[in-house]
Structures are given as C-alpha cells and as structure tokens.
C-alpha cells in the first residue's frame, strides 16, 4: 500500500482544507495510507473515527510560515514540512504533499531526500490546458531562477520521461521556450541549450509562448524565472477573463439568459483551467515523490495532489528518468 506524507499545517488556511482533502482522497481510494504531519491535537479533532486505521499522525510543533526565508527550513527540524520530508527520506513514506512554503519544500526535498542520478537541478513541472483537448507540460516553473544550458537539457529529458509515463504520450514533442522559432533566436542560455537539446530525437526546436496553449508541443522547457512568469501570467489572464465574462454577462437580462443556456460549457471551461483539478506540481528529479500544492489549495486540490503523488509513484518514473539520462547525457 502506498504511503503519502501530508504536511497538514502548510497552506494559507490552516489544517482544515488539508485534512478534509486527505479524507476525500481516502473515501475514493482505499489503496493508500495517509500520514498527516502537524500538531496532533488539532489534527485529531478534524478526523472522523472511521478513518483512524488509515491515517497516522506524526506530531510536529513548528510550522514554517510563508513569509519566512526558505533557508530556515534546514534548521527547523520540528517543523511539519521537515518531518514530512524526513518520512520519505527514511522510507516510511513514498511521497510527500505540501501546500506550505514552496521554497522550503523544494530545499528540503533536494537536500534531505536527494536528487536522482545524473540530475543536477530538480525542476517544478506544471500542466497547461490547450485547445486540442490535451495538456502541455512546462518546466521549470520556479525551482531554478538561474540555469545553465545543461540544466535545460536535463529538464527536456525529464519532461520527455514524464510525458511518456504520466501523460501517456507515445512520442512527446519537446520544445525550448524562446522569443522566436528560428535557431538563431534567444539569448546565450537558450542558444547553448538548443545545441544540446538537438541530440534528443523528440526535440522539435524553439517554441513561442502561444505554443504552450495550441497543442503543437507536449513539453516546453525553460528556466525557472521565465517559467514562473509564464505560470503567474497564465493564472492572471484566466482569472481576468473569468471576471470580465461575469461582468459583461450581468449587463443585460438577455445575456444572463444566454449564459444559463451555456452553463455546461462554462463548467467544462472552468474545469480545464482550475488549478484544483491538477492538485499540485511535481518536483521532478528528486528521489521519491514531492508534490508542491498552491497555498490557497481547497480540499479538492489536496485530494487531487494526493492522487497525483500516487500516480507518480506507481509509474516508476524516477527509474525511467535515470535510465533515459544515462542514455542521452554526453559522456566526459
């Protein structure tokens, strides 16, 4: 049975949505055990008795707040995220899910659990909607602000493995995010990364921002600085469009009537762009499984983050990443 450690105290709204999301996951999936890490008394009051045999509680006195430095994480051994990560390091859990301090989670997972063989920098990967009824994968979206060409090469290989193992894409197309499709476009980093990525049979060359959403490419590679801006901009645009639509619909009764007739369409669209449908973003390149969830995660988002962790673990993707990197990494 898969064991998932959940940072019960992380997140903007305290333990309630985290624990409620864990219980939702347990209701729907009987094939995993949850280890909730945090203040024992607070957690116990939120757990129905019938789930006691499927939930273990590991007490943690401390919580790393969102406004604290990520460098604090390694010193705070009594914090909920530190203890949750340690459960993976010691083999007591196969994966960890946290909606807490993302920098602390990344640092602890990288330094305490450790990186996979031939991985120099783990990357955060996120799924993006496209209008071709499939998803695209973007990495890195925030783990590494400054990158070297070899890091982007590794991201391409890891993204390729993820698309094959998790997204079930037979021959994923890997693209490098740049300011133009031509090989001569980009900065020094992307030009040098392009040269390295050309050795991958799945590499299709440079892609532009619009290609993230048009379904023409499965894996989009970029540094964490660029990727995080892409992610936050996408979230902002989706939110702005939603609010603009609501404001314009309310202007006339006819529009409101038309909106009611399109309720199913709007519901389907919301599902495509709602972060809670994805649950979280995997930190690819570390041992075990680390899922980083949004601080504002709802119970539904936590439930889906746990499911994402289970899928990640069962896919044996880490073995596939190590094998693929061994095959394609230049020797010497």
Swiss-Prot record:
InterPro entries: FA_synthesis, Phospholipid_synth_PlsX-like
Protein known as: Phosphate acyltransferase
Originating organism: Nitratiruptor sp. (strain SB155-2)
Gene (UniProt): plsX
Job of this protein: Catalyzes the reversible formation of acyl-phosphate (acyl-PO(4)) from acyl-[acyl-carrier-protein] (acyl-ACP). This enzyme utilizes acyl-ACP as fatty acyl donor, but not acyl-CoA.
UniProt keyword Magnesium, yes or no: no
Cellular component GO terms held in the UniProt record: cytoplasm
Single Gene Ontology MF annotation: phosphate:acyl-[acyl carrier protein] acyltransferase activity
One BP term from GO: phospholipid biosynthetic process
One Pfam family cited in the UniProt record for this chain: FA_synthesis
């Amino acid at each position: 049975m898969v064991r998932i450690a959940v940072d019960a105290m992380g997140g903007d709204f305290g333990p309630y949505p985290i624990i409620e999301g864990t219980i939702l996951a347990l209701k729907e999936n009987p094939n995993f055990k949850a280890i909730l890490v945090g203040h024992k008394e607070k957690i116990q009051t939120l757990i129905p008795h019938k789930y006691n045999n499927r939930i273990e509680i590991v007490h943690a006195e401390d919580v790393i707040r969102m406004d604290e430095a990520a460098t604090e994480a390694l010193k705070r051994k009594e914090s909920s995220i530190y203890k949750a990560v340690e459960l993976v390091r010691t083999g007591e859990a196969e994966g960890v899910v946290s909606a807490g301090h993302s920098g602390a989670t990344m640092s602890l997972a990288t330094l305490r659990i450790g990186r996979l063989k031939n991985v120099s920098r783990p990357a955060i990967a996120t799924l993006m909607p496209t209008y071709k009824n499939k998803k695209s994968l973007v990495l890195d979206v925030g783990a590494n602000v400054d990158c070297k060409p070899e890091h982007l090469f590794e991201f391409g290989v890891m993204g390729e493995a993820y698309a094959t193992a998790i997204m079930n894409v037979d021959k994923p197309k890997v693209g490098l995010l740049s300011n133009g499709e031509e090989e001569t476009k980009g900065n020094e980093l992307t030009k040098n990364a392009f040269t390295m990525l050309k050795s991958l049979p799945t590499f299709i060359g440079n892609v532009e921002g619009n290609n993230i959403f048009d379904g023409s490419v499965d894996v989009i590679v970029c540094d964490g600085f660029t990727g995080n801006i892409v992610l936050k901009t996408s979230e902002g645009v989706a939110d702005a469009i939603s609010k603009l639509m609501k404001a314009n619909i309310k202007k006339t009764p006819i529009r409101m009537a038309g909106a009611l007739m399109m309720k199913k369409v709007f519901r389907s669209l919301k599902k495509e762009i709602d972060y809670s449908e994805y649950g979280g973003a995997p930190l690819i390149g570390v041992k075990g499984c680390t899922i980083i969830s949004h601080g504002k995660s709802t119970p539904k988002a936590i439930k889906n983050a746990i499911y994402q962790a289970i899928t990640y673990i069962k896919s044996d993707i880490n073995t596939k990443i190590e094998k693929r990197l061994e095959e394609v990494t230049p020797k010497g």
